[in-house]
């Protein structure tokens, strides 16, 4: 494979190969992109094999591999007793590049410029040693501030300790531990081979978890000096992509709450999610990445739910109303945001005119919340309930009302009340509902309401023919046929041929249709990935077409004097390039926000 053929070659491999190669080419250069494309195509290879397939000299390949390993773009593995080193693709580094702009923007907003600079240095270098970074600073006071920022980022899980096994593929680590355990598990006449293998798997799981959690004890991570707890300066840290994926999940769930419940309740929901975000379950688990370990979808679902339930039992993802009240933004005013039964009753019944002049005192009564707090209620003349609150109107009772609203509803529950006043977030069920909701919205907006009705109908029926669907959705068969064709063309439905005769004559054959979420989501995800890769390729192609002009603008004597030194046609081309790049970047980010839900 030649460098010139790289874009077309990666385009025909798979959507992910196309996107990952495009990102690698933009950030790391053509040689790195070619190596990554080769590893995606052929799997694990040695440096000699990579050189043979890419036509790049071995010395240059090894030099590039060192940089790619440092950037978490490639795993390496050496079998015990062998000198050969195998390399395989690691998508973590490429995904960090994909989200790098959003990562720095988010850290800047919530942690400040200095923290963003630390994260940016980690992203650029792949990983850094804390003492190496701190020693570059001369001012002692500044050093202490930077150490504090490192401690805060580490505590909030934005950066994590990097250990040697992080450079190895999960499958190879598992296989090595499993073979050692199986070898040490003796065969007996009373124990079947199935039971022996199952026992070895359980022991290997324990060893694997212990390996992942090794080096995470407080004595390994922290030092206490003069009564101040700080990170061990000898630690090597890297960016935690899983932590940023949790932030993306929070953003998606808040958008869902906005569309389903409303803006004010969504603001409260956002604060609740941020309260438990750092302790929430990861989107992926090493056991789910090991091929052949968990194959059954039901078993995988049970495993994910068990992780979530364990966090709830440990109170890591549980919050109460008072904790949430302290975290709410000061500019959020919840007064009159809840309509009570008195308001509805007032509007449904005629007003009784009073013989008095209307200056009677309004009745007040005490209500008791689930937190056993007595709160005074004042019934206004319009029937609304005025609840005593603090300065910005965020009383415990009002927050409780909004949480009740979020934990109820006919659709998926955004919160679950486990004990009076204590709530948790059902992440597993919410992510499933989030995918369904966005998929149905996409069908409705792109293919039309009739296609949306047919899709919902098939979800309910599981399987059906044109006539059954037509009777269910109350549309003509011709309309149903046209809409089914559109859904089939978009790979959102599957078709099954049912012959009525042994010769399978077309005149005696009818067709059944079904919708399977997994394959529909997979096709949608691949389409989004391909679209993102196309946008990046278009930007790169347009820049290469005007390479001479861009190099001219980068010259020191031209910078800042473009209007004086460039021709009018060159200025127009430069403006067109900028407009096109901004437009494509906006499109890319919109597609990426949808892709993040289905990845």
Curated annotation (Swiss-Prot):
One of its GO terms (cellular component) is RNA polymerase III complex. GO terms for molecular function: DNA-directed RNA polymerase activity; single-stranded DNA binding. Gene3D superfamilies: Winged helix-like DNA-binding domain superfamily/Winged helix DNA-binding domain. Keywords: DNA-directed RNA polymerase, Nucleus, Transcription, Zinc. Residues 359-370 have a biased composition (Basic and acidic residues). The keyword DNA-binding does not apply. Residues 528-549 are annotated as: Leucine-zipper. It is found in: Nucleus. InterPro entries: POLR3C_WHD, RNA_pol_III_RPC82-rel_HTH, RNA_pol_III_Rpc82_C, RPC3, WH-like_DNA-bd_sf. GO terms for biological process: termination of RNA polymerase III transcription; transcription initiation at RNA polymerase III promoter; tRNA transcription by RNA polymerase III. It holds the Pfam family RNA_pol_Rpc82. Residues 350-375 are annotated as: Disordered. Belongs to the RNA polymerase beta chain family. DNA-dependent RNA polymerase catalyzes the transcription of DNA into RNA using the four ribonucleoside triphosphates as substrates. Specific core component of RNA polymerase III which synthesizes small RNAs, such as 5S rRNA and tRNAs. Component of the RNA polymerase III (Pol III) complex consisting of 17 subunits. This is DNA-directed RNA polymerase III subunit RPC3. It comes from Scheffersomyces stipitis (strain ATCC 58785 / CBS 6054 / NBRC 10063 / NRRL Y-11545).
């Amino acid at each position: 494979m030649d460098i010139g053929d790289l874009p077309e070659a990666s385009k025909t491999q798979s959507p992910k190969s196309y996107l990952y190669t495009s990102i690698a080419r933009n950030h790391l250069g053509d040689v790195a992109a070619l190596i990554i494309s080769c590893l995606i195509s052929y799997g694990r290879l040695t440096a000699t094999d990579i050189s043979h397939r890419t036509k790049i000299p071995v010395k240059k390949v090894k030099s590039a591999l060192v940089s790619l390993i440092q950037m978490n773009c490639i795993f390496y593995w050496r079998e015990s007793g062998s000198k050969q080193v195998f390399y395989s693709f690691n998508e973590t580094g490429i995904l960090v590049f994909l989200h790098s702009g959003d990562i720095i923007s988010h850290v800047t907003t919530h942690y400040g410029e200095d923290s963003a600079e630390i994260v940016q240095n980690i992203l650029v270098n792949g990983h850094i040693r804390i003492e190496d970074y701190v020693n570059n600073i001369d001012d002692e006071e500044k050093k202490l501030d930077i150490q504090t920022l490192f401690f805060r980022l580490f505590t909030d899980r934005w950066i994590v300790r990097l250990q040697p096994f992080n450079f190895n593929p999960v499958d190879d680590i598992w296989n090595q531990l499993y073979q050692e355990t199986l070898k040490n598990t003796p065969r007996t006449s009373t124990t079947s081979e199935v039971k022996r293998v199952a026992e070895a798997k359980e022991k290997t799981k324990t060893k694997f978890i212990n390996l992942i959690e090794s080096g995470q004890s407080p004595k390994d991570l922290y030092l206490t000096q003069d009564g101040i707890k700080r990170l061990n300066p000898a630690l090597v840290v890297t960016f935690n992509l899983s932590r940023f994926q949790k932030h993306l999940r929070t953003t998606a769930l808040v958008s869902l709450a906005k569309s389903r419940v409303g803006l004010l309740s969504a603001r409260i929901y956002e604060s609740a999610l941020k309260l438990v975000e750092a302790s929430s379950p990861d989107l992926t688990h090493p056991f789910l990445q090991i091929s052949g370990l968990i194959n059954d979808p039901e078993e995988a679902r049970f495993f994910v739910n068990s992780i979530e339930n364990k966090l709830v039992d440990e109170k890591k993802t549980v919050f109460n109303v008072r904790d949430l009240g302290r975290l709410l933004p000061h500019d959020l005013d919840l007064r009159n945001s809840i309509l009570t039964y008195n308001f509805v009753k007032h509007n449904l019944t005629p007003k009784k005119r009073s013989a008095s002049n209307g200056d009677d005192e309004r009745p007040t009564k005490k209500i008791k919340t689930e937190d056993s707090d007595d709160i005074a209620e004042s019934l206004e003349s319009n029937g609304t309930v005025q609840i005593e609150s603090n300065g910005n109107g965020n009383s415990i009772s009002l927050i409780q009302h909004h949480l009740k609203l979020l934990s109820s509803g006919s659709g998926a529950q955004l919160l679950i009340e486990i004990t009076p006043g204590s709530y948790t977030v059902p992440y597993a069920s919410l992510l499933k509902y989030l995918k369904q909701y966005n998929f149905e919205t996409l069908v409705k907006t792109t293919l039309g309401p009739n296609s949306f009705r047919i899709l919902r109908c098939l979800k309910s029926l599981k399987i059906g023919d044109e006539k059954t669907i037509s009777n269910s959705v109350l549309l003509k068969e011709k309309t149903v046929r046209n809409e089914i064709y559109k859904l089939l063309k978009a790979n959102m439905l599957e078709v099954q041929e049912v012959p009525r005769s042994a010769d399978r004559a077309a005149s005696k054959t009818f067709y059944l249709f079904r919708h399977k979420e997994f394959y529909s989501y997979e096709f949608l995800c691949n389409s989004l990935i391909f679209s993102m890769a196309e946008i990046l390729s278009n930007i790169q192609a347009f820049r290469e077409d005007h390479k001479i002009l861009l190099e001219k603008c980068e010259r020191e004597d031209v910078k800042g004097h473009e209007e004086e030194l460039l021709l009018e046609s060159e200025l127009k081309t430069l403006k067109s390039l900028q407009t096109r790049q901004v437009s494509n970047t906006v499109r890319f980010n919109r597609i990426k926000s949808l892709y993040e839900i289905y990845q």
